[in-house]
């Protein structure tokens, strides 16, 4: 990325009813007291990876706190490999709504997340999940 905005970023584990969900989060650095509108990016079927982390960074650089959950955390993997279709088929809207509730709770407690409305972005398999959580 050219003209990079300085970001705070890293991995966090968010507790859900089904276990610890690893998420990558980023937000603008520089003002520790600033709060930013949240955006949740839901992964596509191949799972979380570098290009999706870069997407989170691009969103954050525009003035948001952006987060992407590893929706395959229940299986203990980031890259589903040959299990992708089985893992994809196993996901239900109920599971994703529960995961999203945990993300919202985490954001509500984060000092740099602005309370109120949030954005949701979904691709491929996660488009239907965004419709379920909104």
Give residue spans per PLM region:
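N-terminal cap/leader regions of alpha/beta-hydrolase-fold enzymes
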Residues: 1-134
